[in-house]
């Protein structure tokens, strides 16, 4: 997909983008306020309780050291105080561990709620997107966003953001404790902090584009894989296995290289920051020892300070180690929100009305359209279909036949001219009522995972079983269905895998028959069935199309010889029109197409 991070995806601008992404991610957490509040409370409680440990240990060490310095047996009287501090530490650590466990359970539930809502938002917007969106982007790439990218964001929300929250608590409390113990040592300790901040920001700015590239390469690989899986029979038939494997290797290599570059650069931060923090600890140890020898700090306080300095540095190291994960999550979030924010199909205007009591008169007047407005595929197209007429549209590939269907259904709006149904401009009626006025059978059949009954009843969920069976009989598929062990309750999987293409085509025809709309579109409706099945379908169609306005688009001219009107298209224009006999008598382009198919 083009510019994945932008569509499905300046220092200041990057910071603003990160801020906006974090705000939107936080809103997803905020939709589950109780779980979020519990997570924050447990995180704070667990960390704060654990952070009292070094202070209590330092007090115990001070008491023991004071007793030994006195060189008197009475020094042992401080043992109750030491045991008190040890017991308090044990209780605090136990409570902290219990809270940490509870926190992990809360985060599992919160994570589940967030990923469910995010996937729903993505899918909800997908249902509102115009057909043009799916014409531009690969299905596998979109699936990559819904699965991989949402999971990546979710993992970051449930783990990385929680880690950041714990880091803030730990760093703040540790710094407060260090200031209360030895302010002078804090100054020494903070010498290396600017270097840590500068280095982290530098690496972050460098790796984020790499993670964007990684997500893009993975989406491209998924799209290619899905495309090849769908076309594996064609690949084998044409002996292109080696070529496909080579193409896959190229895309796979690109994805692996992008992954390696992103991870290699992302993992630099952790070791580097850890090294800087170790230098800081070395400085604290040296100056702390000098301060102790001069009597400026007690042994227990120095021990506490060193432990707090480690606790201060530890979370920073952990955050540095997840910089790569965070950048990956930001790149994934850009793609997820890019899909959520993709421009939906324009809403019907406030004046739009329902298309009711459709008679089936369709008129196209001077229609011009191009997927790229600068390159029209339909030019100044005119058509008048009377109610109940059978209109056939024929022509070579790329002539604009299927585009006509998309315009009739208002999947796209014409750039010039107008389309009317029963004298009403289709822009003035609701899209839903317009599309329900048509039944459609496409060349590429679509069956969902469900029973045969549910597939035929799709679009008319309230249909009775008798109506479904009647439609199946009319489509000449009833006998095949009844021969199956489960009959109409047979469950189809993977777009009808296990039944023939012709049978899948017949099921979609039965679906269109059941819908019984006043207008019918057949796009290559019988191109995927054998001659005998085609004859059966044609016989059923002639009876069921009576009284309906029908548009048939086919390369096989045998299917449309009885059409009331035939439009012959070439390069986006109607070059001939009339019935079969008239067009054959003209001995023009249609006659050439016909003879090319049937002569000899």
Where are these regions (language model features)?
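Juxtamembrane helix-loop junctions of ABC transporter transmembrane domains
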Residues: 11-18, 41-42, 49-65, 69, ...
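ABC-type nucleotide-binding domain
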Residues: 341, 348-349, 355-600
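An intracellular "coupling" helix at the cytosolic face of ABC transporter transmembrane type-1 domains
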Residues: 34, 131-132, 150-157, 161, ...
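A short amphipathic helical element positioned immediately N-terminal to and/or at the very start
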Residues: 18-33, 142, 146
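Conserved catalytic Walker-motif region of ABC-type ATPase nucleotide-binding domains
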Residues: 126, 248, 336, 364-366
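Transmembrane helix-loop-helix hairpins at lipid-water interfaces of multipass membrane proteins
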Residues: 36-99, 179-184, 295-299
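Transmembrane helices of ABC transporter permease
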Residues: 31, 35-48, 89, 159-213, ...
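Helix-loop-helix
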Residues: 177-191, 261, 265-334, 339-340
């Amino acid at each position: 997909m083009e510019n994945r991070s932008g569509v499905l995806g300046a220092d200041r601008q990057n910071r603003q983008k990160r801020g906006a992404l974090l705000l939107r991610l936080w809103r997803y957490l905020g939709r589950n306020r109780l779980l979020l509040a519990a997570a924050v409370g447990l995180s704070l409680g667990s960390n704060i309780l654990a952070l009292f440990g070094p202070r209590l240990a330092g007090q115990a060490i001070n008491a023991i050291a004071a007793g030994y310095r006195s060189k008197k047996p009475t020094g042992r009287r401080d043992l109750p105080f030491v045991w008190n501090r040890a017991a308090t530490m044990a209780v605090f650590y136990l409570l902290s561990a219990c809270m940490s466990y509870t926190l992990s359970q809360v985060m599992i539930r919160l994570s589940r709620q967030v990923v469910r809502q995010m996937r729903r938002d993505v899918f909800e917007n997908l249902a509102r997107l115009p057909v043009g969106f799916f014409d531009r982007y690969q299905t596998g790439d979109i699936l990559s966003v819904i699965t991989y990218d949402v999971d990546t964001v979710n993992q970051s929300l449930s783990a990385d953001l929680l880690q950041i929250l714990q880091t803030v608590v730990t760093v703040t409390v540790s710094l407060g404790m260090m200031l209360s113990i030895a302010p002078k040592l804090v100054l020494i300790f903070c010498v290396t902090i600017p270097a840590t901040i500068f280095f982290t920001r530098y690496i972050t700015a460098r790796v984020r584009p790499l993670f964007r590239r990684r997500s893009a390469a993975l989406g491209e690989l998924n799209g290619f894989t899905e495309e090849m899986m769908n076309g594996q029979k064609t690949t084998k038939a044409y002996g292109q296995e080696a070529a496909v494997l080579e193409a896959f290797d190229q895309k796979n290599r690109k994805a692996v290289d992008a992954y390696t570059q992103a991870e290699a650069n992302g993992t630099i931060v952790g070791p580097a920051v850890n090294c800087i923090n170790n230098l800081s600890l070395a400085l604290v140890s040296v100056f702390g020892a000098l301060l102790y020898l001069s009597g400026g700090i007690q042994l227990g306080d120095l021990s506490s300070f060193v432990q707090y300095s480690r606790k201060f540095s530890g979370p920073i190291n952990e955050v540095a180690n997840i910089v790569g994960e965070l950048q990956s999550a930001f790149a994934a979030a850009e793609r997820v929100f890019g899909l959520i924010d993709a421009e939906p199909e324009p809403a019907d205007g406030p004046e739009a009305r329902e298309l009711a009591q459709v008679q089936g008169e369709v008129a196209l007047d001077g229609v011009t359209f191009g997927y790229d407005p600068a390159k029209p595929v339909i030019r100044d197209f005119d058509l008048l279909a009377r109610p109940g007429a059978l209109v056939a549209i024929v022509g070579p590939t790329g002539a604009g036949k299927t585009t006509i269907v998309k315009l009739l259904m208002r999947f796209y709006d014409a750039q010039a001219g107008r389309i009317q149904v029963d004298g009403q401009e289709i822009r003035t009626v609701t899209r839903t009522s317009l599309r329900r006025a048509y039944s459609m059978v496409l060349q590429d059949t679509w069956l969902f995972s469900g029973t045969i009954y549910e597939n035929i009843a799709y679009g008319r969920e309230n249909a009775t079983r008798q109506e479904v069976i009647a439609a199946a009989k009319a489509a000449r598929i009833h006998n095949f269905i009844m021969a199956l062990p489960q009959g109409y309750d047979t469950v189809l999987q993977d777009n009808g895998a296990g039944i023939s293409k012709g049978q899948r085509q017949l099921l979609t025809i039965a679906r269109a028959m059941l819908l019984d709309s006043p207008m019918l579109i057949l796009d290559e409706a019988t191109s995927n069935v054998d001659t005998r099945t085609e004859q059966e379908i044609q016989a059923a169609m002639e009876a069921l199309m009576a009284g309906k306005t029908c548009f048939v688009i086919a390369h096989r001219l045998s299917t449309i010889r009885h059409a009331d009107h035939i439009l012959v298209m070439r390069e986006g224009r109607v070059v001939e029109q009339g019935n079969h006999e008239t067009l054959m008598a003209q001995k023009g382009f249609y006659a050439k197409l016909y003879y090319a198919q049937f002569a000899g």
